[in-house]
Structures are given as structure tokens and as C-alpha cells.
């Protein structure tokens, strides 16, 4: 049986192959334990060469990218081509797995409902927040329609997988069967680092600097406060960038020499080493589903502070959380973390207890239960049409 996976992630195409940091071929093994092969519908970006790493297509996995779709603005002039391309993929596949929030995913859900085809969803974030806090006027305009589309896409699904334990399932209930707390973390490290702090304090944050919802502005303002108090701080941003907006903001707050834009870190070992060289990890997001970067930071033994947005409280204890945009509280938490080794040790110990439940084997068992439930629904759907997919 072929499973179609639909999501907006931008895969990079070089010659006849496809590459992605977040969606390497290894990711698809989550689903290939139950389904025979996969077809992927996503956005695409053609590249000449560059960082050709983390191949996504391969054995049992093929791509049919939606070339007409670049951003939500593409819907204005190319909606017909986008709908046609998705419809072809949906009809030629036995099952459809939609990851939301995503525009392609919302469209795929509408098509499935129209042709009465059962589909399942993976809910990894909140649509309204993702668009409202994106940083553009167009994003704010789209936030309510996208929230409506996500609520309906999830409600009408046969099976829903949620990456959080409560937050997303409460926000987006499903009329079908729900599977909660199916984290999308790829690995959980078990590293104990030295928590001593030297003269220079290294603080890290992961997230694209081309969107506002990862809270880079909150981090810059907070670091500015601490630098003004006399601390020698280096704030490192990992992810797409640098963006002109946050470079100018760092300059405005007189911390341009304290803020380092490191860009993407493709290699997993290099990323773990980056974490282990930090004194503190912060995630001041305005919205989150289940933040993998937080789990990776905690697993690498880094004291971690985060906003209480979305599912962050699944991983980070209440004492180390602050409200989104609360620069004052974040500044106080960082200050206390710097001054007290005991506080840092308690942070790591308590947060590690929270992520100890992310046993990858157990998560995969639960994911496979969801996939098997969906596979049975598909079989029943085709048997009602006189087609035996197991023959």
C-alpha cells in the first residue's frame, strides 16, 4: 500500500534527488513499518549544489513536489494547478497522511472530504499562532482562515496524531480516533555536561530568523538588559539567517557584537557539540507545538528556559517557564541561572525527568498503533468498493 504524505516543508532538489534537514530518509521509516511505499507532496527549492546532505528520497520513497506552490500567495494565481496536482497524488495513493499546519495539507483535507476518502493527520502546531506571529501583515490576514481550515481538517480526519500530550488535542479535537503525546523527536541524548560557567556566558536559540514566532526579538532585548548589567554574553542563533530585521535590532540594542548568527547546522554530531558548549538554552517562542530543540537541549544536559507557549510545558518545568514576550521574566530567569550553579543543576535534573518519557521505542509503538488503525480504515473503505488491497 502507498501512503501519501502532504506538508509544506521546502525540500531542496539537486539533479534528480531531494534533500532536507528535517525530513531525511530516516524519518520515513516511521511509516514504512506499516506501509509498503510513500509518495511525498511538498514545496521544492532547486539548488545548484551547496550543503547536499540528508537525502530524503530513496528506497520506497518518491517525491512529487507541488512546483506551483511557493507560499500562500501562490493560491491567488495558481490555485487550480495546486488542487489538480494534489488531487492526482491523492487518487493514486491508498492512504493520505497530512501534517498540519500546512496550506498543502489543508487543501489535501478538503479534496479528501470532497471525494470521500479517509485520511489521517499529524498535528504539530497551532495554525492561528503560526500565521499571526509570522511577522508579516499577510500572515496576520491569513491567521483566522488558516485556523478555521485546521480545525476542520483535524475534525474530519479518521485518525489524529498529536505531538503534545494535551495542548493540541484540546485545541483541535478529532471526530475520529486520537493518539496523543506522539512526539516527533528523532533522538534523545543522555549527556551530562559540566555546568560551570566561565567569564563569557554562551546562550543559544534555534529557529529561523525569517519568522517572528521563535522569539528572537525577546532574546535580543533580554540579552541587552544583561549586557547593560555588566555580563559578558554571547547569544548564538542557529537556523535560517541572518535576517536583516534581527541584525538591525541587535545593532539598535547595542548588542551587535554579542549576537552571533551561525546559520543552519546540518550535521547531528556538530549540533550536539554546539549544544554541549552552551551555558544556557532559551526558547522564547510565541507559539510552539512540541519543540524538538528543547528536548535536544535538555538531553544534552543544557539548562533550559522557555516560554509557556504550546507544548513547551511538556518538557520544561513550570519554574523555568515565562509568558511569551515577557522580557523582564526571561531576564530574571537568565540572571538567576548565571548566578546559581545549584539552580542550573536543578533545572537540568527536573527537565530531564520530563523528557524521560520520550522513549523512542514506545513512541514508535504508539505511532504504529495509529497507522494500523488507519490502515484498517483504508482496507474497509476499499472493501466496500469491492477492492481487496491485501490481495
From Swiss-Prot:
Keyword Ribosomal protein on entry: no
One Pfam family here: Glycos_transf_1
Q: Copy the pathway line from the protein's UniProt record.
A: Capsule biogenesis; capsule polysaccharide biosynthesis
Q: Which SUPFAM superfamilies match?
A: UDP-Glycosyltransferase/glycogen phosphorylase (SSF53756)
Molecular function via GO: glycosyltransferase activity
Keyword annotations: Capsule biogenesis/degradation, Exopolysaccharide synthesis
Look up keyword Transcription and say if it applies: no
Name the GO terms of the biological process aspect.
Answer: capsule polysaccharide biosynthetic process
Question: What function does the entry list?
Answer: Required for the biosynthesis of type 1 capsular polysaccharide.
Q: How is this protein named in the record?
A: Protein CapJ
State the organism named in the record.
Staphylococcus aureus
The taxonomy runs: Bacteria, Bacillati, Bacillota, Bacilli, Bacillales
Amino acid at each position: 500500500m502507498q501512503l501519501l504524505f502532504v506538508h509544506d516543508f521546502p525540500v531542496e532538489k539537486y539533479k534528480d534527488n531531494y534533500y532536507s534537514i528535517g525530513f531525511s530518509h530516516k524519518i520515513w521509516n516511521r511509516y514504512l513499518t506499516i506501509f509498503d511505499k510513500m509518495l511525498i507532496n511538498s514545496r521544492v527549492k532547486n539548488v545548484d549544489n551547496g550543503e547536499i546532505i540528508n537525502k530524503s528520497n530513496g528506497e520506497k520513497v518518491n517525491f512529487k513536489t507541488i512546483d506551483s506552490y511557493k507560499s500562500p500567495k501562490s493560491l491567488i494565481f495558481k490555485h487550480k494547478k495546486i488542487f489538480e496536482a494534489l488531487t492526482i497524488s491523492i487518487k493514486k495513493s491508498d492512504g493520505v497522511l497530512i501534517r498540519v499546519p500546512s496550506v498543502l495539507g489543508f487543501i489535501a483535507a478538503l479534496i479528501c472530504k470532497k471525494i470521500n476518502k479517509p485520511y489521517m493527520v499529524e498535528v504539530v502546531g497551532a495554525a492561528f499562532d503560526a500565521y499571526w506571529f509570522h511577522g508579516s501583515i499577510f500572515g496576520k490576514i491569513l491567521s483566522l482562515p488558516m485556523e478555521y481550515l485546521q480545525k476542520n481538517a483535524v475534525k474530519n480526519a479518521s485518525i489524529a496524531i498529536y505531538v503534545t500530550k494535551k495542548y493540541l488535542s484540546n485545541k483541535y479535537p478529532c471526530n475520529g480516533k486520537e493518539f496523543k503525546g506522539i512526539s516527533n523527536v528523532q533522538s534523545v541524548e543522555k549527556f551530562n555536561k559540566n555546568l560551570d560557567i566561565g567569564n563569557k556566558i554562551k546562550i543559544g536559540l534555534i529557529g529561523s530568523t525569517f519568522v517572528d514566532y521563535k522569539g528572537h526579538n525577546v532574546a535580543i532585548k533580554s540579552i541587552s538588559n544583561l549586557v547593560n548589567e555588566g555580563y559578558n554574553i554571547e547569544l548564538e542563533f542557529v537556523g535560517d539567517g541572518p535576517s536583516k530585521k534581527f541584525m538591525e535590532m541587535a545593532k539598535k540594542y547595542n548588542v551587535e557584537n554579542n549576537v552571533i548568527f551561525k546559520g543552519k547546522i546540518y550535521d547531528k554530531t556538530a549540533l550536539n557539540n554546539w549544544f554541549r558548549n552552551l551555558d544556557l538554552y532559551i526558547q522564547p517562542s510565541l507559539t510552539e507545538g512540541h519543540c524538538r530543540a528543547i528536548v535536544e537541549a535538555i538531553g544534552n544536559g543544557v539548562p533550559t528556559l522557555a516560554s509557556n507557549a504550546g507544548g513547551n510545558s511538556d518538557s520544561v518545568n513550570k519554574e523555568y517557564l515565562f509568558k511569551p514576550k515577557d522580557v523582564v521574566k526571561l531576564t530574571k530567569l537568565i540572571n538567576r541561572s548565571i548566578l546559581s550553579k545549584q539552580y542550573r543543576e536543578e533545572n537540568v535534573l527536573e527537565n530531564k525527568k520530563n523528557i524521560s518519557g520520550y522513549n523512542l521505542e514506545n513512541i514508535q509503538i504508539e505511532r504504529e498503533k495509529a497507522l494500523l488503525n488507519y490502515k484498517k480504515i483504508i482496507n474497509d473503505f476499499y472493501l466496500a468498493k469491492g477492492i481487496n488491497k491485501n490481495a
